[in-house]
Amino acid sequence: MSLQIGRTERARSPVFVFAHKRQLLHGRCSTIDNANCSTCSMKINSTCTLTALPIAALPGPRTTSHYSTAAANWCYATVAPRARSSTIAASLGTPAPSSSASFRPKLIRTTPVQAAPVAPALMDAAVERLKTGFEKFKTEVYDKKPDFFEPLKAGQAPKYMVFACADSRVCPSVTLGLEPGEAFTIRNIANMVPAYCKNKYAGVGSAIEYAVCALKVEVIVVIGHSRCGGIKALLSLKDGADDSFHFVEDWVRIGFPAKKKVQTECASMPFDDQCTVLEKEAVNVSLQNLLTYPFVKEGVTNGTLKLVGGHYDFVSGKFETWEQ
């Protein structure tokens, strides 16, 4: 049963929304009751958090009570303190709140919500943020270190090749203090490295080939991290099930050997703990896959190339490494 929501009349008090963010690549929150998710049909158990945000900061028509943005994948429910509201979800049999009643909206969604377009003002602000960020970098870093940046104009000679997750919370140049020119970096979902194949994953293969054969990197580092959504997606995959996210699920299947190992050896552990173990085991699978590339295998055998695994825990602020 899908939800139908009426329009909310303008209230004297500021209107806020409670934004519920889906925490999985797939999985769907079916019920949101004010500030608590009372029922959740996600494939793993996780706490649903709600954040109060000014409605003026959100895209889309202000009279629409339920919509989502494609980029953030949030569901929004408008809430006006003591709102004078029209009926909500007649299909649920929920009476309209009186003007003196506390308004507690309930959203029940069983089908994905169509994304609303982002307001032009928000898009302009996002682009401006990039421009101001560069200006700060140029005045505070680039212009003050000409001796550092001048050699980079002639070419690059990085010591490291780094595989890291595309997760926005994970930035190896920041967490490891890497300067421009130090690391040839590849980022993707769950920091995966596929096995050698001439007909598939050429994007990753070409990067490895160039880093090892042309740039002559000395160390290849594969870095996993805490609370990785790609790893959760991998552990949640059911054999034979249809893909909800075709590209993502096809990609994370690279880590299937690690998943099977964790499910066999850690079956009694809670899901979140299994994910933590899998974050590291998936790194080991990627390190093993690196050895299937002839030029990588040759470098390791000759002692000119080293393979290193790493794990960044941004919850506890820890970083660990191990060698293949």
Curated annotation (Swiss-Prot):
It holds the Pfam family Pro_CA. It is an enzyme of class 4 (lyase). One of its GO terms (biological process) is carbon utilization. GO terms for molecular function: carbonate dehydratase activity; zinc ion binding. It catalyses: hydrogencarbonate + H(+) = CO2 + H2O. Transmembrane segments: none annotated. Keywords: Chloroplast, Lyase, Plastid, Transit peptide, Zinc. Reversible hydration of carbon dioxide. Belongs to the beta-class carbonic anhydrase family. Homohexamer. This is Carbonic anhydrase, chloroplastic. The lineage of its organism: Eukaryota, Viridiplantae, Streptophyta, Embryophyta, Tracheophyta.
